[in-house]
UniProtKB/Swiss-Prot annotation:
<dbReference type="InterPro" id="IPR050456">
    <property type="entry name" value="DeoC/FbaB_aldolase"/>
</dbReference>
<dbReference type="GO" id="GO:0004332">
    <property type="term" value="F:fructose-bisphosphate aldolase activity"/>
</dbReference>
<keyword id="KW-0963">Cytoplasm</keyword>
<feature type="active site" description="Schiff-base intermediate with dihydroxyacetone-P">
    <location>
        <position position="184"/>
    </location>
</feature>
<comment type="subunit">
    <text>Homooligomer.</text>
</comment>
<dbReference type="GO" id="GO:0005737">
    <property type="term" value="C:cytoplasm"/>
</dbReference>
<keyword id="KW-0704">Schiff base</keyword>
<protein>
    <recommendedName>
        <fullName>Probable fructose-bisphosphate aldolase class 1</fullName>
        <ecNumber>4.1.2.13</ecNumber>
    </recommendedName>
</protein>
<dbReference type="InterPro" id="IPR041720">
    <property type="entry name" value="FbaB-like"/>
</dbReference>
<dbReference type="InterPro" id="IPR053414">
    <property type="entry name" value="FBA_class_1"/>
</dbReference>
<dbReference type="InterPro" id="IPR002915">
    <property type="entry name" value="DeoC/FbaB/LacD_aldolase"/>
</dbReference>
<dbReference type="GO" id="GO:0006096">
    <property type="term" value="P:glycolytic process"/>
</dbReference>
<dbReference type="Pfam" id="PF01791">
    <property type="entry name" value="DeoC"/>
</dbReference>
<dbReference type="InterPro" id="IPR013785">
    <property type="entry name" value="Aldolase_TIM"/>
</dbReference>
<keyword id="KW-0456">Lyase</keyword>
<comment type="similarity">
    <text>Belongs to the DeoC/FbaB aldolase family.</text>
</comment>
<keyword id="KW-0324">Glycolysis</keyword>
Length: 272
């Protein structure tokens, strides 16, 4: 018989990955990059969260403050993953490869969250500190039946190209071996190379980090398609959704690729 914790984790994972795949809206950009990246008309988190929920995302990954402010909008409609680590871009340059605690697994449970997320900068001079914190987070989440999503980002003074397939695959493998239930990481530029990242993760779902807004929505849809063709578990997207001209159309197009197997050309027709 499986444990109560295993049941809880499976139930929550089924909300995050309804068919084994997921379109997750990432919205931790205010603390990470400042409000300047968010269009002024979308600065109110209640307005933006309502729009992405109605657009049809499967889950939201955000900070505890935004989860608390918008609970009545997302509750019972989408899965909620709360990020418990963070940093600002205005902290000293020497500390840019370190994330600090901004919440706890217990607060995630208190807020009604379905999952917990935290970053590890693999290769950073602070890797030891971040890995120690990740382990505490994961073990507490395991005890309470919450899936743990690791933002597995290779970054550090000795990493020349953080998007190189060998580096990204290393980070994905390290995330799997340190107990991640879901892995968010960089796109490596091609289906073939990202397939190596997926393989390195040993069966743990690998979701592409959306990154900066692409020059065109069509270009981003090609990335999404490439990830899914490589066996990825979906995408975690922020700027390519909240900076889009039409949020609902963009989410609809991404969903069509992730859940319905549309190719980029067919999905692009949904953009209007």
């Amino acid at each position: 018989m499986i444990s109560s914790q295993d049941v809880g984790k499976r139930v929550r994972l089924s909300r995050i990955l309804p068919d084994g795949r997921s379109v997750i809206f990432a919205f931790d950009h205010g603390i990470e990059h400042g409000p300047g990246e968010i269009p002024e008309e979308r600065l109110d988190p209640r307005l933006l969260i309502r729009e992405v929920v109605e657009a049809g995302v499967d889950a939201i990954m955000t900070t505890p403050g935004i989860a608390r402010l918008t609970w009545d909008i997302w509750a019972n409609r989408v899965a909620m993953i709360i990020k418990v680590s963070g940093k600002t871009s205005i902290r000293p340059q020497d500390d840019q490869f370190l994330q600090s605690a901004i919440s706890s697994v217990d607060e995630v449970v208190a807020l009604g969250g379905d999952g917990v997320a935290a970053t590890v900068y693999w290769g950073s001079q602070f890797e030891d500190k971040m890995l120690e914190r990740w382990t505490r987070i994961r073990l507490r989440a395991e005890k309470l039946g919450l899936p743990a999503l690791q933002l597995a980002y290779p970054r550090g003074p000795h990493i020349k190209n953080r998007y190189a397939v060998d580096i990204v695959a290393y980070g994905a493998r390290a995330a799997m071996e340190t107990g991640a239930d879901l892995i968010k990481t960089y796109y490596t530029g091609s289906t073939e190379s990202f397939r190596r990242v997926v393989s390195a993760a040993g069966g743990v779902p690998v979701l592409m980090s959306g990154g900066a807004r692409t020059p065109s929505p069509q270009e981003f849809l090609h990335k999404v398609y490439s990830v899914m063709e490589a066996g990825g578990g979906g995408v975690v997207v922020g700027r390519n959704i909240f900076q889009a001209g039409d949020i609902r159309a963009m989410v609809k197009a991404i969903r069509a690729i992730v859940h319905e197997g549309f190719d980029p050309e067919k999905a692009s027709k949904l953009l209007g």
